[in-house]
Amino acid sequence: MKNKIFHAFVLCFFIIVTTVAQQKKITVFAAGTEGHKSYRIPAIISLPGGKLFAFCEGRVNGSGDFGDINIVMKTSDDKGKTWSALRTIVDAGRLQAGNPAPVVDLTDPLYPSGRIFLFYNTGNNAEGEVRKGNGLREVWYKTSADGGLTWSKATNITLQVHRPRQPRVNAAYNFAEDWRSYANTPGHAMQFNSGNYKGRIFVAANHSAGEPRQHFTDYTANGFYTDDHGKTFTLSENVPVPGGNENMAVALSGSRLMLNFRNQRGDIKSRIVAISSNGGASWDTAYFDKNLPDPICQGSILQVGNNKGQNILAFCNAADTARRNLLTLRISFNDGRTWKKNIWLTKLLTGIKVIIPLIRTS
């Protein structure tokens, strides 16, 4: 579920290079410029050579979550200091294209330099109406094998990774599960780079099912993955915690996977965590991490290194339980069990945020 608040008039990525003193705020997409009145839902990845790709929703007519919305991209060759002109990668006409979830596949022998996958959603009505059954969300991807210069035609994977009941739109969309609202992960998808599931691309997601329920308990977190470089996809089990929303995935040591997501119910103001020992197919445990306070807002999590056989994780969110304030970066040296280093970035009102692997943990 996307934020209704559009904070300020620019969208910024926080790039943490070494220490807090070196923190620098870079304006990548400025509202009211380059053909769009608003920019929301950022996502960012890097290629092995260091080139950065920033994606987001370019909202043509305003900051609302539904309408004429494109997926746009900029690139940087100098670690985010300067950025290219804007390019439109997905244009769904007057309808919505959103929830960009990019990832670089570095394990396909056909593409030794890597191939970028851009997963995204389309929608033909506002989220509240889709949640009532009056609309459809679909799931797609595009790829680029030349560093973002050109992009493939879109591939529709809705039948593999979604369970809509909209037979009037498509006779095949007649699933008993009756999933309605659907959103890919914010920030980025992920790929296992080692272990039992090396090469698996996992896209965290969330969906609503059936008629709307109080406190958004019709929502739940899930994900989907491919082990054959996008030829086929498999759905994960749902995380058995009602209200899961804006879900991100990160690799842990021992071929495990963590999901980290917001609690849309709002009764407990902390992040929800789910752990999988089989690469995200099912979930061993799910719990509220009281060390990660959250005001019901999107957060971002990323693996940034390894420490004595355990993955080093970086997590960034608004750490004020009352309002979307206190943007904080936290570092865990033990697969997210504890968070030892907490860096306060800004007290200002904040919404969507992402982190990228320019972090040095020494």
What function would you assign to each model-found segment?
Residues Q22-S362:
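Asp-box/BNR beta-propeller blade signature and adjacent active/binding-site loops
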Residues M1-Q23:
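Bacterial Sec-dependent N-terminal signal peptides
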